[in-house]
From Swiss-Prot:
Residues 355-366 have a biased composition (Basic and acidic residues). The gene is nitA. The active site is at 48 (proton acceptor), 131 (proton donor), 165 (nucleophile). Belongs to the carbon-nitrogen hydrolase superfamily. Nitrilase family. CDD domains: nitrilases_CHs. This is Aliphatic nitrilase. Gene3D superfamilies: Carbon-nitrogen hydrolase. The keyword Hydrolase applies. Residues 346-366 are annotated as: Disordered. It catalyses: an aliphatic nitrile + 2 H2O = a carboxylate + NH4(+).
Length: 366
């Protein structure tokens, strides 16, 4: 049963990473986690791929030039799920008794993913969800998620969900999230300063509109967290004035938004680092849903509905003959999650996965 009576405090981070340095950015992340906990928060949220930072170089140079300069370093500083860096994040959540949603560049074998880690206050990994479809030139760096990455998680304080960046432009993805009665949503973004003012769709106003609309459409609280572009970013990514103009400056728009669309905390300047704090009262959701509940009384499923495949999929299913096999297949460290081992014609056993059984559901119709 979904409850709407809890009250608690949340934190939204607006900050830049230590560019493409996983260890130092984890240090900064742990420090921010501690600060949010000292201020009485039950949840702190971090930007998209905060560790080790958003790859702005893909937007300001040719793919070949960007790869030559940054690809190896970015790959090396992306996090594997069994890395000491991830363990430090889990430990920080446990030590400070606070839930954490943090964006990382996840390395799985040779591929990278735009991942959000959902960690509870006991330091347990609740979810590792990947961006379903990286945006535009992001697809030259990152792979895709799957249906199991669209989910909402029961936390002690609320039903919690998270999406990255332009996933907030994906109408069907949003509707699937709303259908799971999400109460608090983490919207993780990079700093949106690219190509301004020539391309308004990439600017702060457009992204903030999408973020605020998420709160209004879903009648949910939104904790919006962003990176910022500072002179340090220019120094790191840019070789000339033209590239500095393309990346721009600032781009921060962290917010904490209520289900009626109002800001619950005073925003920072677009180029300022800091943490926003706000108190959440879930009963405000019930007031908003009295007017419009798009997955309840304000829906018409007989006219419009969504097919939602939440199954976790993998590119390889391995069959092993029990008659002719001379050794047992053992999944190697870092192997694909959910690769299946088939012993005989009728037996199928899933290898260990970070996903729960719940995320392996068959296609659902909403």
């Amino acid at each position: 049963m979904v409850e709407y009576t809890n009250t608690f405090k949340v934190a939204a981070v607006q900050a830049q990473p230590v560019w493409f340095d996983a260890a130092k950015t984890v240090d900064k992340t742990v420090s921010i986690i501690a600060e949010a906990a000292r201020n009485g928060c039950e949840l702190v949220a971090f930007p998209e791929v905060f560790i080790p930072g958003y790859p702005y170089h893909i937007w300001v140079d040719s793919p070949l030039a960007g790869m030559a300069k940054f690809a190896v370093r970015y790959h090396e500083n992306s996090l594997t799920m069994d890395s000491p860096h991830v363990q430090r994040l889990l430990d920080a959540a446990r030590d400070h008794n606070i839930a954490v949603v943090v964006g990382i560049s996840e390395r799985d074998g040779g591929s990278l993913y735009m991942t959000q880690l959902v960690i509870d206050a006991d330091g347990q990994l609740v979810a590792r969800r990947r961006k379903l479809k990286p945006t535009h030139v992001e697809r030259s760096v990152y792979g895709e998620g799957n249906g199991s990455d669209i989910s909402v998680y029961d936390m002690p304080f609320a039903r919690l969900g998270a999406l990255n960046c332009w996933e907030h432009f994906q109408t069907l993805t949003k509707y699937a999230m709303y259908s799971m009665h999400e109460q608090v949503h983490v919207a993780s973004w990079p700093g949106m300063s690219l190509y301004q003012p020539e391309v308004p769709a990439f600017g702060v106003d457009a992204q903030l509109t999408a973020t605020r609309m998420y709160a209004l459409e879903g009648q949910t609280f939104v904790v919006c967290t962003t990176q910022v572009v500072t002179p340090e970013a220019h120094e790191f990514f840019c070789d000339n004035d033209e590239q500095r103009k393309l990346i721009g400056r600032g781009g921060g728009f962290a917010r904490i938004i209520g289900p009626d669309g109002r800001d619950l905390a005073t925003p920072l300047a677009e180029d300022e680092e800091g943490i926003l704090y706000a108190d959440i009262d879930l009963s405000a959701i019930t007031l908003a849903k009295q007017a419009a509940d798009p997955v309840g009384h304000y829906s018409r499923p007989d006219v419009l509905s969504l097919n939602f495949n939440q199954r976790h999929t993998t590119p390889v299913n391995t069959a092993i003959s029990t008659i002719h096999a001379t050794h047992t297949l053992v999944p190697q460290s870092g192997a694909l999650d959910g690769v299946r081992e088939l012993n005989g014609a009728d037996e199928q056993r899933a290898l260990p996965s970070t996903h729960s059984d719940e995320t392996d559901r068959a296609t659902a119709s909403i």
